[in-house]
Amino acid sequence: MSPEQWGIYGWTFSHAVALGYPINPTEEDKLRYYTFFNSYRYVLPCGKCRINYADHLNKYPLTDEVLSSRENLVKWTIDIHNVVNYYTGKKMLTYPEAIEAIEKTLTPKKKSSYNWFFIILIIIGIIVIIYLMYIVFKKKLNK
């Protein structure tokens, strides 16, 4: 499967997972996250990406230092993402730029005000229909 089909979602998920890493991780946390990120080399939906990710892990391993804090793990995911961006000719981001982009991506989109417009329009329509039914019913009773 082409990275263009799933890449943005994979990166968003990876960064979100890193942001969910404990600030002060336990040894169990470290092992679980190490296993999680290490397993990408076996499950990415692109064969070339699996090979490249394994190479990136060899060059930029998930060390005890990386796993010592949330900040370090988030920076590591940004570093790995930047390595991929370098090889794919995309812009590499500083940590502040990357964190801003990640937070923007993870921020829920506000619902359009058009939704409220249509809800109000439907309510007004229902009120008009009920009023017209009332007038018709009242005229039939008066006959």
UniProtKB/Swiss-Prot annotation:
Residues 10-104 form the ERV/ALR sulfhydryl oxidase domain. The chain crosses the membrane at residues 117-137. Keywords: Disulfide bond, FAD, Flavoprotein, Membrane, Oxidoreductase, Transmembrane, Transmembrane helix. Signal peptide: none annotated. Its EC number is 1.8.3.2. It is a single-pass membrane protein. It comes from the Viruses. It is found in: Membrane. One of its GO terms (cellular component) is membrane. It is an enzyme of class 1 (oxidoreductase). GO terms for molecular function: flavin adenine dinucleotide binding; flavin-dependent sulfhydryl oxidase activity. Its cofactor is FAD. It catalyses: 2 R'C(R)SH + O2 = R'C(R)S-S(R)CR' + H2O2. FAD-dependent sulfhydryl oxidase that catalyzes disulfide bond formation. This is Probable FAD-linked sulfhydryl oxidase R368. The lineage of its organism: Viruses, Varidnaviria, Bamfordvirae, Nucleocytoviricota, Megaviricetes.
